[in-house]
Structure formats: structure tokens, C-alpha cells
């Protein structure tokens, strides 16, 4: 990470200084900016407060989304941090919100330090470190779910309090949604590969898609977070991306983690995915069974998780085929770009293996068909 002096960075710092000075009632001076990267066009900096009232942290992180980015994402991220601030440190999934300005599209957060990311730990060929990191991720999700179940009304109230007049921010809408992808992807699979999706599978997809917006055991979720947006600190797992935080069925979160983590592993470690999947799922269940007693049944758990994984792979497939066409919609703004051909194929292969382990011939058969189609396809763009 390098110290930055570029004008856009200076402007972000000046804006943050003004915001923090108003909040503290005294002059705040920030220095030594470090570029932390960021999703899309966002500027994310670590700064040190060299002139600092006692109440502010000595080191903070500033995030600003430039004009042209999704206003809804900024609003939802602010509300997600406000909501998370109400949780105890043990249950809070990420940094604390220090200050924000909707008008300036700027957020100031506590600094979590320079801990390794989940993706960096998964890339290490150290089975013990990988196992520890994945279990910490699963347990962090479980603790967060238990601490926030039943509080969707509080989150919705925070959204309403911001009083946005020109941006539609539905409290339940974290992404375009699974239901809207079912018919289009059916048509794509039919036209591109002459592949028909079994009606029984469509019914299951429709039922699972509803869980983004209603039903199920609903708790707070930072939304679909990639391993490179997760820090593994000495205090546990901390999630960095809240752009589409909200409430949804808890199974969707563990299923998303199971869907994305294997592509960050080395080839040898991928041979142990079945064991890692089971261990993660069990670590998560040990916490959430208190709020979702039905998941104590192994068959129920396996079916629910498999259906949710199917939904995530279906969504990724839809994004793979459509994201380059629909750059003006919110698909790109959700922070997870369309997967590469190799990553998408890997997700279908993993889904097939999971379906085989569960003994689900419908999902396994469909996955086999899609895998064959993708393997016969020329690479679109890696």
C-alpha cells in the first residue's frame, strides 16, 4: 500500500476532515493516506488523524463513491453500518460507522488494521489455516444471524429515516433478485444449448428465490460477500462490504459462502471440499439451530442448503451471460462481477458433487447437462 497525493484523494480527505470536524466540534486533520482499493470506482483510503479530538479513532478508513455510482448502494451501506453499530462487538460483522454524508457519498469507518483477507488465507497450502479461516467465517455468520433475527423492522425504520425521495430502496431488495433470472436463463439455455430445465427444478428455484424478499428465518446479511472482502483478524472474521446489506433467509448466506470459497483454493485443497463443506455447515448450524430448530434435521438442512446453492449458481450463470449486455442496470452495482468461464464451470461442478452427496438426482442431472454445455463452449471472456 502506497501513500497517495493525487488530487481526487486530497479532495476526499478534505471532505472527510470537514465532516469529522463538524461531528466532533473541533478541528480534525487527516494525513498519510493509503490506498486500500475498493469495489468499482469507489475510493477507499486508510488515514491517520494527526489532529484529533479524544473521541475519534487515531486511524480510520474513508470510502467515497463517485458521482455516477449507485445511490441506492450508498444508502443501503450507510443503513447497514448504522444497524451493525447497534450490535455488540462479538456479533458485529464488520467495522463501526464513525460518520457519513449522503450528499458527499462518503463513509468513515473504524480501521480494522492490516489483517490478511480470507482469499489470501485460502490460497495458502496450509490445511489447518484454511480450516480455521472457514470455520471462523461460518461461525461469524451464525452468531450474526442469531443476534439479528427478528429485527428486520429496525432495519426498515433506518432506511425510512434517511428519507430518500428519488431512489427506490426497498428494505427487502438486496439484488435484482433470483425470480427475475429464472425465465431469461431458461431461454438462454434453450437457445444456446438446446437444454431444457426440468419443471421440478424451476419450482424449487422459484421457492428459493422468494427467500430474498420474504419468508424463511430472516436475519441481517451483508449480502453476497467475496473472500477478498473478508478480513481474518485476531478478533475473528470481519466483513468489509455492506453495499447490499439487508434481511433475508439465513440459509442463503451459508450457501453463498459454500458456493464461492472453493475457487480460491489450490488444486490439492479442492480435493477436500466435501469435508470442508460439511465442517462449515455444521459450524454454522451449531449456532443457528437455536433460531431455526428445523435445521437440526440432517435431511432438511441438506435439502435447504442445496436449493440455496442451486439458486446462487443459477444467479451467477445469469450474470455470466447478461452482465456485459446490461451495464446500465444494477447488476454491476452489487459488487460481485460476473464470474469467469472457469469459475462458473467450477461452481456447477461443485454443485453437482454436492447434489450427488445429498442424493438429489434432479439437481445432479441438470448440473451434468450444464457442465457438458459449458465445456463445449468457446471461452467468452476470462
Where do the protein language model's features map onto the residues?
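Short beta-strand micro-motifs within the conserved protein kinase catalytic domain, predominantly
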Residues: 96-105
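Active-site activation/catalytic loop segments of kinase-like enzymes and analogous catalytic loops
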Residues: 252-293, 307-328
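ATP-binding glycine-rich loop module of kinase domains
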Residues: 41, 45-74, 120-123
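Conserved short submotifs of the Hanks-type protein kinase catalytic core
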Residues: 104-116
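ATP/Mg2+ or Mg2+-diphosphate-binding catalytic cores
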Residues: 309-382
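Juxta-kinase regulatory segment immediately upstream of eukaryotic protein kinase catalytic domains
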Residues: 1-35
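Conserved kinase catalytic-core helix
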Residues: 115-158, 204-205, 211
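Active-site catalytic-loop/activation-segment of kinase and kinase-like phosphoryl-transfer enzymes
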Residues: 1-12, 156-209, 353-359
Amino acid at each position: 500500500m502506497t501513500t497517495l497525493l493525487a488530487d481526487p484523494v486530497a479532495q476526499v480527505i478534505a471532505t472527510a476532515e470537514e465532516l469529522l470536524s463538524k461531528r466532533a466540534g473541533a478541528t480534525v486533520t487527516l494525513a498519510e493516506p493509503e490506498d486500500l482499493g475498493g469495489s468499482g470506482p469507489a475510493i477507499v483510503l486508510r488515514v491517520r488523524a494527526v489532529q484529533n479530538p479524544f473521541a475519534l479513532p487515531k486511524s480510520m478508513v474513508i470510502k467515497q463513491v463517485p458521482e455516477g455510482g449507485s445511490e441506492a448502494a450508498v444508502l443501503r451501506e450507510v443503513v447497514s453500518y448504522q444497524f451493525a453499530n447497534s450490535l455488540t462487538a462479538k456479533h458485529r460483522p464488520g467495522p463501526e460507522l464513525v460518520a457519513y454524508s449522503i450528499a458527499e457519498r462518503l463513509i468513515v469507518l473504524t480501521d480494522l488494521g492490516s489483517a490478511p483477507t480470507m482469499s489470501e488465507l485460502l490460497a495458502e497450502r496450509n490445511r489447518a489455516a484454511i480450516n480455521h479461516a472457514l470455520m471462523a467465517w461460518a461461525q461469524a455468520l451464525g452468531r450474526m444471524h442469531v443476534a439479528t433475527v427478528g429485527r428486520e423492522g429496525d432495519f426498515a425504520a433506518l432506511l425510512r429515516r434517511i428519507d430518500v425521495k428519488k431512489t427506490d430502496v426497498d428494505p427487502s431488495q438486496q439484488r435484482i433478485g433470483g425470480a427475475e433470472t429464472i425465465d431469461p436463463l431458461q431461454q438462454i439455455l434453450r437457445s444456446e444449448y438446446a437444454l431444457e430445465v426440468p419443471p421440478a427444478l424451476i419450482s424449487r428455484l422459484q421457492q428459493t428465490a422468494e427467500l430474498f424478499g420474504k419468508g424463511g428465518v430472516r436475519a441481517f446479511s451483508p449480502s453476497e460477500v467475496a473472500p477478498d472482502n473478508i478480513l481474518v483478524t485476531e478478533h475473528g472474521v470481519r466483513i468489509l462490504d455492506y453495499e447490499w446489506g439487508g434481511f433475508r433467509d439465513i440459509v442463503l448466506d451459508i450457501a453463498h459462502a459454500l458456493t464461492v470459497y472453493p475457487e480460491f483454493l489450490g488444486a490439492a485443497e479442492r480435493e477436500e471440499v466435501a469435508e470442508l463443506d460439511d465442517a462449515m455447515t455444521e459450524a454454522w448450524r451449531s449456532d443457528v439451530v437455536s433460531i431455526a430448530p428445523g435445521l437440526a434435521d440432517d435431511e432438511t438442512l441438506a435439502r435447504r442448503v442445496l436449493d440455496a446453492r442451486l439458486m446462487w449458481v443459477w444467479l451467477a450463470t445469469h450474470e455470466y451471460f447478461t452482465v456485459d449486455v446490461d451495464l446500465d442496470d444494477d447488476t454491476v452495482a452489487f459488487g460481485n462481477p460476473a464470474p469467469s468461464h472457469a469459475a462458473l464451470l467450477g461452481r456447477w461442478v461443485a454443485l453437482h458433487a454436492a447434489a450427488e452427496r445429498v442424493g438429489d438426482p434432479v439437481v445432479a442431472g441438470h448440473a451434468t447437462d450444464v457442465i457438458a454445455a459449458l465445456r463445449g463452449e468457446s471461452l467468452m471472456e476470462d
